[in-house]
Amino acid sequence: MTAPNEPGALSKGDGPNADGLVDRGGAHRAATGPGRIPDAGDPPPWQRAATRQSQAGHRQPPPVSHPEGRPTNPPAAADARLNRFISGASAPVTGPAAAVRTPQPDPDASLGCGDGSPAEAYASELPDLSGPTPRAPQRNPAPARPAEGGAGSRGDSAAGSSGGRSITAESRDARVQLSARRSRGPVRASMQIRRIDPWSTLKVSLLLSVALFFVWMITVAFLYLVLGGMGVWAKLNSNVGDLLNNASGSSAELVSSGTIFGGAFLIGLVNIVLMTALATIGAFVYNLITDLIGGIEVTLADRD
């Protein structure tokens, strides 16, 4: 136990509940009332705390033993409480009281409470655009399935690999040839006429023969007019009449327009039938020949 006048002893109100602040405030009010004039050398109340802290820092109070069950509060702590009371600052929380603190209610957490936790649902539905753009996963090619059967499977795989190599080699050669042909100049293609349709040949030949018939008739009419204007037909008829009169005594015209155009018409009809039939028969014969020895080879090329 210590005497009340010792510097380390606690005052009457310096307990854990800081009741001394009230007593000191009351004493201060009594001392500074209307009946007492403060001394000129006394510092104002808002500067007393700083003066006391500086004095407490210069001198160190001796250790004081306190009874069990009562916490120790040095005068510096009381001065600090007084300074905080005057300045209006909040006291820092230390010791076990700092470890156990009442958690402040979170408005966001209160909004997220309830059935289904909508806050978490909203957070999961919104995409995260802050990070880099995700890349699509690369798919690995499916590994080739091992063939069953031991030596037989090995032989099949070897044959398949050799066949694939030969196909790739052939395709490569074809590409090389094609590129070489392109570099040379115009593209050339050799083809064979292997078959001719007889029905299409018949139709085409019939149309061509009819067209040639009209051409034939126009040509005959033109020649008849030209030769008639030159007097060939009259001279020929007179000469033939003289020969017939001397021989039989009768005269007749050998050349006339009716005889000439009639003969030309008959010749044209015969040509139509013959040309159509010959073309159709020729198509059949050509198809037979192509089956035996091949068709006519035709080379197609670009223009120079």
Swiss-Prot record:
Subcellular location: Cell membrane
Family annotation (InterPro entries): DUF3566_TM (IPR021949)
Keyword list, A-Z: Cell membrane, Membrane, Transmembrane, Transmembrane helix
Topological type in the membrane: Multi-pass membrane protein
Residue stretches of biased makeup (Low complexity): 132-166
Location of region: Disordered: 1-183
Gene Ontology cellular component list: peptidoglycan-based cell wall; plasma membrane
Principal place of residence: membrane
Record-annotated membrane-spanning stretches: 206-226, 265-285
Family: To M.leprae ML0007.
Protein name: Uncharacterized protein Rv0007
